[in-house]
Amino acid sequence: MSLYQWFVFFLFIQLVHFLGTWKLYVAAGRKSWEAAMPVYNVIILMKIIGRPSWWTILLFIPVINLIMFPIIWVETLRSFGKRSTLDTFLGIATFGLYIYYVNYTQKLTHISDRSLKAKTTTGDTVNSLLFAIIVATLVHTYVVQPYTIPTPSLEKSLLVGDFLFVSKINYGARIPMTAVALPMVHDSIPLTKSKSYLSWPQIPYLRMPAAEGINRSDIVVFNWPVDTVHYFFEPKGKPGVIKPVD
């Protein structure tokens, strides 16, 4: 999908959000139009469900947002008294569309002072696991990632099977091109041969700003655009540098 197509999809999601939640905004003491304003509507929703505004950022980070959306659906339902296991199941199983049913058919009462702490040990454990997965995925995808050397191409300095951590900040982390993927899994689901991602939709090639350029003798990790296997190499030259070949 091109950036234009993603923009159109973003506007479509805003329409879906508005139609399914505007009565919830009104019940929480907000204006109905606030549910229709892109980005601003999410900030207001965070206030309605009693969560920090910086959660809004997580909803726009690829891979991380796949974890955050179900959390937001459940938190929204609970903010209006829908706390049962069935409500939680329906909210997730219908990809949030259960909120439409609540929005248009139920008597809406906003619980502004609800407790944000889990009432059971299981609930507390799930919350802790979700938080750990989000942090680990954020670090794994955009900050640093562990790799195992797959080939003997650098055998004079690194051996096959060597384990190392690779910084993604130095040369600029690449935004994941697969919008739907399992967190912290590279290519296939463990113990299976199934792909851990969907080939469509795809995000156009984007890369975050680099902290520094590539220098000679740096160990660099890369993969071909059409390949999922990562390779390691040690650059011996830079663009514009003339090197004699014996």
Question: Where would I find each of the regions flagged by the language model?
Answer:
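Phosphate-binding glycine-rich loops and adjacent basic patches that engage nucleotide phosphates
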Residues: S2-L3, S32-V39, K119-V126, E212
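Extended hydrophobic leader/signal-anchor segments used for secretion and membrane insertion
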Residues: S115-D246
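Membrane-cytosol interface at the C-terminal ends of transmembrane alpha helices
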Residues: L11-I111, V143
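Feature marks short, highly hydrophobic, charge-poor N-terminal signal-anchor/signal peptide-like helices
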Residues: M1-F9
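A broad, low-specificity signal for short, low-complexity segments enriched in glycine/proline
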Residues: Q5-W6, H17-G20, G123-L129
